[in-house]
From Swiss-Prot:
ATP binds at residues 11-16. Keywords: ATP-binding, Cytoplasm, Glycolysis, Kinase, Nucleotide-binding, Transferase. The lineage of its organism: Bacteria, Pseudomonadati, Pseudomonadota, Gammaproteobacteria, Lysobacterales. This is Glucokinase. It comes from Xylella fastidiosa (strain 9a5c). The keyword Cell wall biogenesis/degradation does not apply. NCBIfam families: glk.
C-alpha cells in the first residue's frame, strides 16, 4: 500500500478575507481536514504568497500542492482579485511557497465543484422536488449553480464516469427578460441608467437597491441612498416597499434560475449559493421563487421534477477547491478499481 497522500493547501480568496484549509483530495466527502480552517484579512498581507506562508507556519504543516479559488478573473498564469489590488502570478506564488503544483481557479468554478462533495446536511430543499446526494460514479449528471452576491455568478457541473467538469460562464450578464407589466416598467427605468440591463443588475446585492429604487420611482417616492442591508432590515420591520422589493427579487431569481436549467440542460438539479442566499433564505422559501422556476410553458411538468437547493455549508469555496484537487490528482494505486 502506498504512503498516505500529503494534504493539499486550499484557499478561498476574496476582496476582504483569505480563507485557508488543508484537504485530503482522495476523500469524496468531508475532504477538509479537521481544525485546519483559518481566516485572515487580506489587508494584513502585501501578497497572497505571504498570507499562505503565514498560514502554513501557523498550522505547522508543509505541503507542496495547492488549489486557490480567486474572487476575480483568472487568465492563464495570472489572477486579479475583484475589489483588491493583489495581482497573483501562479508560477511566482508557487516558487515562493516551494510548491510543485499550484492551480488558480475562479471562485465560482470552486462553487460548482463543491456540488460533488455536498451532503444532505449542506443544503436546504426549495420546493417539493427531491434531490439525492451526487453519486460520483454516475455515468451522467448535469447540475446548474447560480449565486447572487456582489454580482451574479452562474455556472454548472457536468459529471461523466466519476469525473467532474465545471462550467465557467458569465451568465449573470445575460439580458434581463421581464415577464410582467411591473417588470417591464422596472426594465424601462433601469435602462435609463444602465442602457443594457443584465440579470446581475437585479439579482445581486446592488440589484436589490436597483429594484427598490425603480419601485420607488413608480410610486413617485424618493427613497434616498440605501444599502442592500437597509432594504432587508426594513422588510423585516414590515416596510411595504422593501417587502415588495424582496418578493420581486425572489420571483425574478426563480424565473432566471429556471431559465438556467433550460439553457444548460441541468436536469439533475440547480444549486443556489452566494452571499445573499443565506440572508434571504426564508423569503426564497416562502416567495414565488419555485412557481416562477417551474413556469416554463410546455416544459413546466419537467421543471416541476427538477430539484432546487440552497447551499448552507459555510465554506463551499474551500470544499470546491478540495474537489478540484481531487480531480487533478492521479488516483493512488491502492484505491484504483
Amino acid at each position: 500500500m502506498n504512503a498516505p497522500q500529503a494534504p493539499v493547501l486550499v484557499a478561498d480568496i476574496g476582496g476582504t478575507n483569505a480563507r485557508f484549509a488543508l484537504a485530503n483530495p482522495t476523500l469524496t466527502s468531508a475532504p477538509l481536514l479537521n481544525d485546519s480552517l483559518r481566516e485572515f484579512a487580506v489587508i494584513e498581507f502585501p501578497s497572497l504568497s505571504e498570507a499562505a506562508q503565514h498560514y502554513l507556519h501557523h498550522i505547522g504543516i508543509h505541503t507542496t500542492k495547492g488549489v486557490f479559488a480567486i474572487a476575480g478573473h483568472v487568465d492563464g498564469d495570472e489572477a486579479r482579485i475583484t475589489n483588491h489590488p493583489w495581482v497573483i502570478t501562479r508560477t511566482r506564488t508557487a516558487t515562493m511557497l516551494g510548491f510543485d503544483t499550484l492551480h488558480l481557479i475562479n471562485d465560482f468554478v470552486a462553487q460548482a465543484m463543491a456540488i460533488s462533495v455536498l451532503g444532505p446536511q449542506d443544503v436546504i430543499q426549495i420546493g417539493s422536488a427531491k434531490w439525492e446526494q451526487v453519486p460520483l460514479s454516475a455515468a451522467t449528471r448535469n447540475y446548474g449553480i447560480i449565486g447572487p452576491g456582489t454580482g451574479l455568478g452562474v455556472g454548472g457541473l457536468v459529471i461523466r464516469n466519476g469525473r467532474c467538469y465545471p462550467l465557467e460562464t458569465e451568465g449573470g450578464h445575460v439580458s434581463f427578460p421581464p415577464s410582467t407589466p411591473e417588470e417591464i416598467r422596472i426594465l424601462e427605468i433601469l435602462s435609463q441608467q444602465f442602457g443594457r440591463v443584465s440579470n446581475e443588475r437585479l439579482i445581486s446585492g446592488p440589484g436589490l437597491v436597483n429594484i427598490h429604487r425603480a419601485l420607488s420611482e413608480i410610486d413617485g417616492i424618493d427613497p434616498g441612498p440605501l444599502r442592500p442591508q437597509d432594504i432587508t432590515m426594513r422588510a423585516a420591520d414590515g416596510d411595504i416597499r422593501a417587502t415588495r422589493t424582496i418578493n420581486l427579487f425572489c420571483n425574478i431569481f426563480g424565473a432566471i434560475t429556471g431559465d438556467l436549467v433550460l439553457i444548460q440542460g441541468a436536469w439533475d438539479g440547480v444549486f443556489l449559493t452566494g452571499g445573499l442566499v443565506p440572508k434571504l433564505l426564508n423569503s426564497i422559501q416562502h416567495s414565488g421563487f419555485r412557481q416562477k422556476f417551474e413556469h416554463k410553458g410546455r416544459f413546466s411538468a419537467i421543471m416541476a421534477r427538477i430539484p432546487s437547493l440552497a447551499v448552507i455549508h459555510p465554506h463551499p469555496g474551500l470544499l470546491g477547491a478540495a474537489a478540484y484537487a481531487r480531480d487533478t490528482e492521479p488516483v493512488p494505486q491502492d484505491i484504483k478499481a
